[in-house]
């Protein structure tokens, strides 16, 4: 969860404030300058507005963070007051991110309850994230595949 530590300051620009906070923490832990640079660079480049897989660690972080969609992320218990983000997350009853045995494809496999949210709603919210996942996978010399309800979409 270190990558989102900047959210304690504000959601806006949390990647940059988080990178600064992580620098202090890692420096106080006597991490090597090379490790600190790699980690804070990944943290500073993981948010949608500024994300870019500048190194393999950043690419892995982007894949993990942007593919994190699941019902348990929704804290609001009143389904009648859900916004589209709540609906999309709540609709995901199963989520799995995996790499094939040949290490050529990273696949995000989702099961979505279409009574709660349509696949189109998912794309309305997460298309940008899926594009970032594809770029991150490419940085790791992988192809990104998205499968929703058994249908390969990317």
Region spans (language model):
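Terminal helices and disordered tails flanking the catalytic cores of nucleotide-processing hydrolases
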Residues: 71-154
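Divalent metal-dependent catalytic cores for phosphoryl transfer on phosphate-bearing substrates
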Residues: 1-99
């Amino acid at each position: 969860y270190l990558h989102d530590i900047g959210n304690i300051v504000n959601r806006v620009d949390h990647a940059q404030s988080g990178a600064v906070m992580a620098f202090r923490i890692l420096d106080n832990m006597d991490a090597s300058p090379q490790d600190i640079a790699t980690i804070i660079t990944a943290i500073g480049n993981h948010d949608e507005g500024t994300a870019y897989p500048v190194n393999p660690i950043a690419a892995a972080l982007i894949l993990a963070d942007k593919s994190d969609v699941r019902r348990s992320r929704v804290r609001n218990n009143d389904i009648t007051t859900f916004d589209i983000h709540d609906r999309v997350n709540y609709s995901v009853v199963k989520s799995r991110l995996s790499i094939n045995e040949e290490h050529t494809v990273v696949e995000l496999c989702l099961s979505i309850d279409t009574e709660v949210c349509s696949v189109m709603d998912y794309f309305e919210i997460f298309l940008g994230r899926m594009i970032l996942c594809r770029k991150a996978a490419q940085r790791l010399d992988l192809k990104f595949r998205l499968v929703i309800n058994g249908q390969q979409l990317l």
